[in-house]
């Protein structure tokens, strides 16, 4: 009988303490950032990611984003079973 009362008490306390958490709402933060990625300028995004664009001046500005030595895979090896 004592175990049943203890279990019921714990369940009631759990419900009471979890109610504020379940009913809480998210707060909207006002920021200067655009809401969608389509509106964001790539230079702004790179600056926010911590990439210093001044290091890449004098070179092709997009070259550091794409590796020109990359080789596309040729598919499955015909010798492999």
From Swiss-Prot:
Q: What is this protein called?
A: CLAVATA3/ESR (CLE)-related protein 6
* Entry GO terms, CC: apoplast
- Would you list which residues are glycosylated? 76
- Supply the alphabetized keyword list: Developmental protein, Differentiation, Glycoprotein, Hydroxylation, Secreted, Signal
Tell me a GO biological process for this protein: regulation of lateral root development
Organism domain of life: Eukaryota
UniProt record similarity statement:
Belongs to the CLV3/ESR signal peptide family.
* Source organism (scientific name): Arabidopsis thaliana (Mouse-ear cress)
InterPro entries reported for this sequence? CLAVATA3-CLE (IPR039617)
Q: Which residues are annotated as modified residue Hydroxyproline in the UniProt record? A: 73, 76
Residues making up the signal peptide according to the UniProt record? 1-26
Do you know which PANTHER family this protein is assigned to? CLAVATA3/ESR (CLE)-RELATED PROTEIN 7, CLAVATA3_ESR (CLE)-RELATED PROTEIN 5-RELATED
